[in-house]
Amino acid sequence: MSEFNNLKLDVENEIAVLTISRPAALNALNSETLDELNTALTEIEGRDDIKVVILTGGPDKKDNAFKSFVAGADIAEMVNFTAPEARAFGIRASVPFFKLMNMRQVTIAAVNGFALGGGCEIAMACDIRIASDNAIFGQPECGLGIIPGFGGTQRLARLVGMGRAKEMIFTCDNIDANEAYRIGLVNKV
């Protein structure tokens, strides 16, 4: 298996646990992390001994608390993108999302803490979503003047219905784990 800077991959008893670990950035997805995620998923997909993939966010290094599953795309990296660079980033980011959706292994998002923007979207790309009590979901992109990327508008509407999806997207309001369960965004709290 490959070595990663922003991911940790553990395989045991036919289960791969893939942990996104960028605690200083609340596990936000930058280009390097997306490339590593794509590499890891490609390697996992090719292994017959792995039946289940659990995607989760790593803890904060200071207090070991789980503050963020994935806080979205890394805005600090994106802020200086030109239009062609932003388009290329969106295309690059969509690859691991579609890979998650189409894997032969069962994919589970174990959501702990923030799942905002791209974090909510990567969770929705998984077959099953399980949220901890401290999970917070949201689509804050409209507050930045953009729409949810990475398939977020389509997946959210399929999971929670068009009305709820529009409300979450247009208002940029976050919801807690219990509300996410109530509306069908997660399978279990």
Per-range role (PLM):
Residues G57-P96, A115, G145:
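Glycine- (often His-adjacent) and acidic-residue-rich active-site loop
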Residues A28-S31, A71, N80, F170, ...:
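Phosphate-coordinating loops and pocket residues in cytosolic domains that bind phosphorylated ligands
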Residues K99-V189:
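Crotonase-fold acyl-CoA enzyme core
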Residues L18, L55, D74, I122-M124, ...:
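Hydrophobic/aromatic residues within transmembrane alpha-helices
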